[in-house]
């Protein structure tokens, strides 16, 4: 999908001083993606999405350790609410924990590390550069897997794959740019919103009806997102106001 742009820039998009980080990022991203897709076959989509909500917690901890980011009270509260909502949905100890759950958890761990690496790279490289390296490296790594497991898709499946690729491209460009603009820990509470969308998609497309605990957990998660959104907008207004006062 991004190949025309790469050719248009005469491959200048690959200019970077972080080639090793790009390589490591792709090496971790591929198994994270494969594990995630595998769990979608084993578990309902809203359950897989809920499990992935451990990512914001891991990322926030890693951001403090490796990016020297500070954790403010509102971000912490939003994360606690988001994680609590996830526990309400999963109900560990009440429902059976299958191999699919463990696969989803390991995928989340790998993806958390990928996010931290992305933040480090994003300081110097553009979103399109990060995505270009990801596309090239992951295509190379996937080639060896495809040799043994290739299945020719039919017309409908091919259309779905193209749509998934387009959505994935937009997703990664947006995420990479977000990590460039703000602290990575600030972006994490917003990821909890995906549960709401996943539940809606699961209901209308796959006939997967979310249970009562899924909706209760979703409400808790949404409250956390509202808190962080309100606080960050308020902080931004204060910064703008102070900037105007200084100029005057």
Where are the model-predicted features located?
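Membrane-interface interhelical linkers
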Residues: 1-24, 73, 123-125, 136, ...
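Juxtamembrane helix-entry segments on the extracytoplasmic side of multipass membrane proteins
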Residues: 14-18, 86, 91-113, 147-163, ...
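Cytoplasmic-side transmembrane-helix entry/capping segments in multi-pass membrane proteins
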Residues: 16-27, 71-83, 100-105, 124-136, ...
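Hydrophobic/small/kink-forming positions within alpha-helical transmembrane segments
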Residues: 26, 30-34, 56-61, 86, ...
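C-terminal transmembrane-helix exit sites in multi-pass transporters
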Residues: 38, 55-77, 196-215
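Helix-helix packing/entry segments at the starts of transmembrane helices
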Residues: 49-54, 121-136, 172-204, 228
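Hydrophobic transmembrane alpha-helices of multi-pass small-molecule transport proteins
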Residues: 74-90, 213-232
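Glycine-/small-residue-enriched transmembrane alpha-helix faces in small-molecule transporters
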Residues: 96-120, 237-248
């Amino acid at each position: 999908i991004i190949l025309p742009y790469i050719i248009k820039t005469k491959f200048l998009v690959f200019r970077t001083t972080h080639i090793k980080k790009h390589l490591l990022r792709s090496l971790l991203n591929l198994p994270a993606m494969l594990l995630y897709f595998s769990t979608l076959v084993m578990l309902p989509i809203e359950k897989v999405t809920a499990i992935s909500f451990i990512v914001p917690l891991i990322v926030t901890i890693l951001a403090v350790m490796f990016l020297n980011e500070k954790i403010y009270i509102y971000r912490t509260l939003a994360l606690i609410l988001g994680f609590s909502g996830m526990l309400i949905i999963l109900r560990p100890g009440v429902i059976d924990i299958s191999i699919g759950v463990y696969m989803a958890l390991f995928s989340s761990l790998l993806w958390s590390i990928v996010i931290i690496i992305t933040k480090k790279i994003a300081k110097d490289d553009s979103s399109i550069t990060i995505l270009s390296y990801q596309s090239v490296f992951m295509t190379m790594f996937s080639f060896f897997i495809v040799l043994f497991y290739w299945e020719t898709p039919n017309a409908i499946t091919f259309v779905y794959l193209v749509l998934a690729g387009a959505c994935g491209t937009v997703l990664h460009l947006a995420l990479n740019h977000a990590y460039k603009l703000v602290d990575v820990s600030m972006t994490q509470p917003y990821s909890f919103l995906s549960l709401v969308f996943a539940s809606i998609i699961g209901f209308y497309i796959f006939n997967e009806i979310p249970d009562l605990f899924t909706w209760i957990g979703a409400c808790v998660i949404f409250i956390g997102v509202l808190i962080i959104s309100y606080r960050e907008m308020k902080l931004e207004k204060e910064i703008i106001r102070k900037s105007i006062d200084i100029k005057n």
